[in-house]
Structure formats: structure tokens, C-alpha cells
Amino acid sequence: MYNAISLIIILPCISWLFPLFFGRQLGYVFVTRMTSTLIIITTLITYYYFYQLLGNNNPINLELFNYLNIDYLDINYNFEIDALTITMLLAITTISSMVHIYSIGYMETDPHQVRFFSLLSMFTFWMIILVTGSNYFVLFVGWEFIGVTSYLLISFWVTRLQAMKSALSAVLMNRFGDAFFVLGLCVIAYVFGTLNYSTIFATAYLINTDLLVLIMLALFIAAMAKSAQFGLHNWLTLAMEGPTPVSSLLHAATLVTAGIYLLLRSANILEYTPTVLFIILWIGALTTLSAGLIAICSNDLKRIIALSTMSQLGMMTIAIGLSAYNLALFHLLGHAFFKALLFMSAGSIIHSILNESQDIRTYGGLLSYLPYTYICITIASLSLMAMPGLTGYYTKDIIIESTYGSYSISNYVVYWIAYLSAVLTCVYSMKILYLTFYSNPNNNTITYYNAHESNIYITLPMFILAIFAMFAGWILKDIYLGVGTDFVGTHILPNNFSYFDTEFSITQFYKLLPLISAILVSILIVVLNEFFAIVFNLNNKYINTVYSIFNQKLVSDQILNHFIIFKGLVTSGNIAHHVDKGSLYRLGPVGINRLLNKASYNVINLSSNTRSSLSMNSMLILITIVSLLLLVLVMNVNFIIVIPVLISILYILFS
């Protein structure tokens, strides 16, 4: 088992470093096949260990070496694989292996394939480090490196100015969250004296609640930035400037799920901070609703799918706010499969279009040209809409039901917000399907003449993920949601979640309402677009104003730039001008220099030849001499100290 754990970590590392150092000698063909093979082997090992954990739910630890040992603080590079970790590894390795295979076909004409595959493997490696660490320090190391790698991947096409700006936006927004992560780690180290999970979780109930609230607020802000929660979500749609395989990997199983994993791993602390749970619940509700509203007013294919990711991350956050950690984890796993399939299908569509346009208004009539892609994206969309029998139905609807089964006014309100978000999901999903495949062609003849299905490297991963999107939820539901299962219960702590209340006390109306609404809204969207053509005919100025606000992401970029970034820069400039180069500058080296220069100048003026200045200086020197003599006589000051001063004054007077 220890060898298996080592291989899960080592193989992606080899897949990253070999192309980095020997890619030019090995060639892009060998590199693409080698990296894909190593990640696939890692995936198979993960599935084997998942099977082992089902029968024997005992975590396995791997201790490497000590990093820091200061007084009572002991930090080690230790790794642990438990049920929570293996679930994350299932999503990470499965999606990463599919993305590697997909990239062989998608990036076949790119001249920098070696660098691209090395970065993909690097991303996978550091994400594995993040989830397998047995303490917050190792988690933080992986956290920082996936932020760096995301910058390198989003800005992969370095000649595109927008790609570079988007990557910078993503990394700066994440650095804001990282600052709070560091704050949380410092408080944890101060309060608990360690960063190890086992010690922290075992003693959390002994710690003052205010300190626990401070810790979890800091960690939650870090998770908000990484998982694109409302208020820190601006970077998410901008990250679509990277290649489509990057979008598939980032938004399905790696970067955006890191924040959710951090909250799940900290569940044992969260249970003692009901205030933070309430905040998490409402931030998740605002996130899922705002993402849906923005998505229905967007027209960029990849950005709509990215906003759907934000919406589903909000659903996971709602589940965490309800203390339903197993529901959040199950939805994270299921969402990884159909979201990766959505992005890959979008990439297949973009790849088949001659000018690689991403505006769905320029599509239409592609059903007969891309039937295989149509089937895959339809399966993924229906799973996202939580249609019965598909993975999303088993992972998503139970979260919406749980909000109604918690017996509080706040949770009832969140139920209707989550329900509205589910309806909006149907709206933008059907919008993609209709404008891409069902509507009349909206492009030129040459585009449709050259439209074609992609090669086997692109279609094979889509087929495999389509299988997962259909059956993974049904196969795994008893493992994660079954009444008698304890697969993840020993590693996360759902003390406040009322599973039986959710299952048996809610009326069928509230259980079936999201499903019925999804079906009716889907039919309504098709009918309205087909027979009434309202999409481009909304000429009312008030409707256009509302549409424009949501199309601009609730003008969040403008608010961020004007009220936070601009004001922050002005404030920083004023502080630098008045404090750093003002008070400190004058009291520091420059002030001392000027003081000494002025004193020297005044001493030099004592030798002036004018009668008035000579009289004044003589009077001052006389007063000084008398004062010094009084010090010697009255206060018993050593005369040896006074003699040099007297000699200097007399020399200045008679020079």
C-alpha cells in the first residue's frame, strides 16, 4: 500500500519533470504519449486503492521528512489517504487522464505541446499533493503551486494580450485569498501548536469559539477566492482565455474544487462555528443565483459553462453550510465528470468551426455536422440539469431538498434560491443546445462546409466521460448517501445535518418541484425560441438595461476596479507620499542629514565678523559655559567630560 501511495505522487511528478528537462530531446510525440500513460497508470492505482478502502476504511499514512521543528511547532511532509482524499483523487486523476488524451488531438498543431503537457502534469501533481497532505502546511504548499501553475496555463498562449491579462487577474484574485490562508495558518499554529489534522480535529472542542470563528473565516475567504464564490468570482470567466483542455481541468477537478476541499477537510472545526456555517450557506446561495442570472445573459460558449461551474460550486457551498458534507463531496465528484464533458464538447465544437468562434449566436444547424458531439453535450447538459437517472440527479437534487429539511426560515429561503438557480440552469443549458444545434444556421457556407467531427483522441475521452455522466451517480449513491454507509463519516463530521428529516419529512411536492420545473422550462425555452423568436427581439429599454447589467457580470468588474482597486491605489499612494516618503523620510536618514547640515551651518555662522553677531554669539557661549560649570558644581558631573566642550566653544569664539 505504501508503494501505491508513493506511485500516486511520484508518477505525476515524473510526468511533469521529464518533459521539462528532456522535452526537446524526447520530442513532442513521445512526451504526449508518455505523460498520458503515466497519468492513466496513476488513475488505475487510485481506483484500486478506492476499492481497497471500500472494504477497509483505514487511512494509510506516508511520512517523508521533517520540515521545521521550532520549540513546540513541528511541521512534517506527511501524506495520508482516507475516504475524503481518495474521493478527490478519483476526480483529479480521472479528469486529468481524460484531459491528457484529449489534448493530444486538440493541441496537435500547437508548436509548444511539450510545455503544455508538462504544465498539465505539473498541475495534476500539485493538486495531488494538496489533497494527500496530512497537515495544513502540505495543503498550503499544494495550494500555492496550483495557483502558480494556473497562471502558466491560462497564459499559455503568451502572444495573446487578453490571455496574459486574464492570467494576471486570476493569480492576483487568488493571492488575496492566499493572504487570509496564511493568516488562518498562523492562528492555527498559535492556538493548537501544530498544523496536523489529527491533533487539531481532536482538540477543536476545547478551543475558544471566537478563535475557531477567526480561523474558519480566514480559511473561508481563501476558499472563496479559489472556488470563485460571490464577491471574488471575477477571475473565473476570464480564465477561459486559456486552451479548452485547461478549462476542462481547472473547472472540473482541480483549481476551483480546492476551496471546497479545504472546507470539507476543516469540517471538524466548522461544526463548532455555527456563525461561519450561516455565512457559508448564504454566500453559496448568492453565488449559485448570481451565476445563473449572469449565464442566461451571456453568449460566449465557454464562459456560460464556466458560470455553470460557479453555480454548482455555490450548490456545494450550500451543502457545506448545511453541514451536509457528504452531499457536497458527492456533488463535487459527480460534477467533475459532466462538467469536464461539457468543456470537451465545447472544445470539439470550437475545434470544428473554421474561425474557432465561441459566440453561440454564430452557430446554429450543427446537429447534422456534429452528431457525436451533440449526443455528448446533451448528456452532460441533462446531467447538469439533474434529469432522472443521470449523475446530476443523484448529486444535486438532494442538496436542494436538504435546504428545506432543516427547519429554519433562513434555510427555507435558501431552498427557493437554490430552486430558482436550478431553473436558470435549465435555461442556459437549453440556450446552448438550441442556438448551437437546433436553430437556423447563422454562419457562412465555408464554415459549414469545413465543419467536422474531431479525431479519436478527442472523441474517446468524451465517450468515457459520457458513461460516467450517466452512471457514476447511480453506482456511487449508496456509498456516499446510503443510510448505513460510513465511508466518509469517519473523516468528516456531519453533526448538525438531519438526513432522515430531509428524506422522510419533506412532502413530494417540494421534492419533485425542481424536476418538474426543469422539464417544463426546457420545453418552454425550445418553444419560445422556435415559434416566437424572442431572443433578439427584446427592444424594451428597461429589459435591455437589466440584460446589460447581467451581461456585464452584475458590473462586478467596474465595482472592483473603481471602489477597491482604484481607491486602494490612491490610498497606497497617499500613504507612501505622506508616511513612507513623508514622516519616516524626514525623521529618518534625510531628516538626520539635514539636521546635521543645519547645525554645521549655524556653527560656521558663529565666526561671522559682524559686531552684532559676535555679541550675540559671545552671550550664547557665556551662558553655555556657565550652564556647564553649574552642572559640574551642583550635579557632580565629571569635569573631564566638560573640558572638551569648553575648549571647542572657546576655539569657535576666538578663531
UniProtKB/Swiss-Prot annotation:
It is found in: Mitochondrion inner membrane. It is a multi-pass membrane protein. Keywords: Electron transport, Membrane, Mitochondrion, Mitochondrion inner membrane, NAD, Respiratory chain, Translocase, Transmembrane, Transmembrane helix, Transport, Ubiquinone. Its EC number is 7.1.1.2. It catalyses: a ubiquinone + NADH + 5 H(+)(in) = a ubiquinol + NAD(+) + 4 H(+)(out). Its main location: mitochondrion. The chain crosses the membrane at residues 3-23, 34-54, 84-104, 116-136, 137-157, 180-200, 204-224, 244-264, 276-296, 304-322, 332-354, 370-390, 413-433, 456-476, 516-536, 629-649. GO terms for cellular component: mitochondrial inner membrane; respiratory chain complex I. GO terms for biological process: ATP synthesis coupled electron transport; electron transport coupled proton transport. Pfam families: Proton_antipo_M, Proton_antipo_N. GO terms for molecular function: NADH dehydrogenase (ubiquinone) activity. InterPro entries: NADHpl_OxRdtase_5_subgr, ND/Mrp_TM, NU5C-like, Proton_antipo_N. Complex I is composed of 37 different subunits. Core subunit of the mitochondrial membrane respiratory chain NADH dehydrogenase (Complex I) that is believed to belong to the minimal assembly required for catalysis. Complex I functions in the transfer of electrons from NADH to the respiratory chain. The immediate electron acceptor for the enzyme is believed to be ubiquinone. Belongs to the complex I subunit 5 family. This is NADH-ubiquinone oxidoreductase chain 5. It comes from Yarrowia lipolytica (strain CLIB 122 / E 150).
